[in-house]
Amino acid sequence: MTKVLVLYYSTYGHIETMAEAVAEGVRAAGAQADIKRVPETVPEDVARTHHFKLDQAAPIATPADLEAYDAIIVGTPTRFGRMASQMASFWDQTGGLWMKGALIGKVGAAFTSTATQHGGQETTLFSVITNLLHQGMVISGLPYNFQGQMRLDEITGGAPYGATTIAAGDGSRAVSDNERDGARFLGQHVAQIAAKLSA
């Protein structure tokens, strides 16, 4: 069975919600989906003061976990147009995997959230994708046969480079149905590609 890791970091829960939708899509394709998160680096008292969502059920990932999967779908909120430092720190610890070529040929994809419609979604996705390319991974985006990213009747996330959501500056906007659909589509699409490549 094709194994897919949904690896994420979430501050207020938006990326956690997207990760769950991605995993639903993976499972719909008949693949195994494991959801793991990277460690929080913000001190707990600071995180509580700023209302971080600390009760996330997903187990903490280690870089060594990545080798076991056929595909890795990475989710992170934006920080000034790039991935959050927590996710960057995790990937900075994957030098040993790079030295062994352990991730070469695996499928990689990305999803993100931003505060606003033009808050750096695509640059954040590319900041993730760059790491995956350096590891030798085969990149998948969110193809345009997911028609939800073409909608003009509502403000919504979605890009050909990955699934996205808009959270609002204070995290008050919930992930929309359309954005969940995009995340599910991404998960299913990646799982289907990984199954073909590992056959």
From Swiss-Prot:
Residues reported in the UniProt entry to bind substrate: W98
A cellular-component GO term for this protein: membrane
GO molecular function: flavin adenine dinucleotide binding; FMN binding; NAD binding; NADH:ubiquinone reductase (non-electrogenic) activity; NADP binding; NADPH dehydrogenase (quinone) activity
List of residues binding FMN: 10-15, 78-80, 113-119, 134
Cofactor names: FMN
Top-level taxon: Bacteria
E.C. no: 1.6.5.2
Catalyzed reactions per annotation: a quinone + NADH + H(+) = a quinol + NAD(+); a quinone + NADPH + H(+) = a quinol + NADP(+)
Domain Flavodoxin-like: 4-190
Keywords from the UniProt entry: Flavoprotein, FMN, NAD, NADP, Nucleotide-binding, Oxidoreductase
Binding-site residues for NAD(+), renumbered to this chain: Y12
Disulfide bonds: none
Keyword Protease: no
Pfam families (UniProt xref): FMN_red (PF03358)
Note describing how the cofactor binds: Binds 1 FMN per monomer.
Family of this protein: Belongs to the WrbA family.
Name recorded for this polypeptide: NAD(P)H dehydrogenase (quinone)
Organism: Gluconacetobacter diazotrophicus (strain ATCC 49037 / DSM 5601 / CCUG 37298 / CIP 103539 / LMG 7603 / PAl5)
Top-level taxonomy: Bacteria, Pseudomonadati, Pseudomonadota, Alphaproteobacteria, Acetobacterales
